[in-house]
């Protein structure tokens, strides 16, 4: 089952990598109430769109979790690919962002609205996700329905 999930998720995501134009939609700060969770041990992160705080290690999939920053050029280039993936997956795979190393929630919310993001975003004020995801961005994890990380992608997805 895990291999089918990984294969399907990667196929949809990588097929969307040929998309070079941004998706022309206005972003929206979305509630995290739809994120599937189990109990977690890491620090709970605030959701920019409301809902209970969620620990990064509590997320249950199928989910694609992308750790990013507004200041990160490769992260911004990935956004059309994730928007396209979300559109193609038709809700069968959650897309969740985790914003790190940010000045304020207001900066992140404005970025979301100006860059076509329409998925839930958690806000890592303290940098606690480094313990879970490691240093550097962008980082993308594929999480299965049991909450196990089944694939890690360090660095940006691109169209090559």
What do these predicted regions represent?
Residues 1-46, 156, 160:
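N-terminal targeting signals for export/organelle localization
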Residues 2, 14, 43, 67-68, ...:
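Conserved hydrophobic/aromatic "anchor" residues
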Residues 37-63:
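A short beta-strand-turn-helix
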Residues 54-76, 82:
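Short active-site neighborhood of thiol/selenol oxidoreductases, capturing the structured segment around
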Residues 61, 92-93, 118-119:
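A generic structural signal for alpha->beta connector loops
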Residues 64-65, 95, 140:
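Hydrophobic beta-strand anchors of alpha/beta hydrolase catalytic cores
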Residues 76-115, 125-131:
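Structural microenvironment flanking redox-active thiols in thiol-disulfide oxidoreductases
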Residues 110-118, 123-160:
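Thiol/disulfide oxidoreductase modules built on the thioredoxin-like
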């Amino acid at each position: 089952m895990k291999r089918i999930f990984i294969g399907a998720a990667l196929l949809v995501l990588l097929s969307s990598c040929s998309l070079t134009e941004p998706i022309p939609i206005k972003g929206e700060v979305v509630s995290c109430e739809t994120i599937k969770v189990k109990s977690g041990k890491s620090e709970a992160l605030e959701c920019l769109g409301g809902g209970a705080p969620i620990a990064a290690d509590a997320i249950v999939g199928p989910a694609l979790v992308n750790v990013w920053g507004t200041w990160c050029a490769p992260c911004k280039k990935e956004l059309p690919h994730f928007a396209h993936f979300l559109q193609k997956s038709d809700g069968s795979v959650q897309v969740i962002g985790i914003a790190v190393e940010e000045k304020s929630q207001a900066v992140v919310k404005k970025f979301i609205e100006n860059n076509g993001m329409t998925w839930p975003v958690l806000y890592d004020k303290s940098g606690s996700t480094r313990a879970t995801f490691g240093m550097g961005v962008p980082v993308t994890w594929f999480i299965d329905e049991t909450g196990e990380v089944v694939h890690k992608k360090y660095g940006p997805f691109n169209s090559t």
